[in-house]
């Protein structure tokens, strides 16, 4: 995989969105602080992530710390 990098969530109860925008009807699921994720895309203040179980979505960049 190109540019494979990992991150860890540093905010409690991070909402994961269907795209790089913050809308209530776009929330797919939530993840807890300390969850490790793989970073797919970094776009402005948003990051597309994938979880170990294959769930994907977008989170605000400030909720993530690169590992």
Task: Set out the residue ranges of the language-model regions.
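A short macromolecule-binding patch
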Residues: 55-63
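Beta-loop motif signature
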Residues: 9-39, 43-44
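Short, Lys/Arg- and Gly-enriched loop/turn segments at beta-strand edges
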Residues: 44-51
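Short, solvent-exposed mixed-charge patches
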Residues: 66-67
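Extended, charged low-complexity segments
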Residues: 37-38, 54-56
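Long, non-globular low-complexity/IDR segments in eukaryotic proteins
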Residues: 1-6
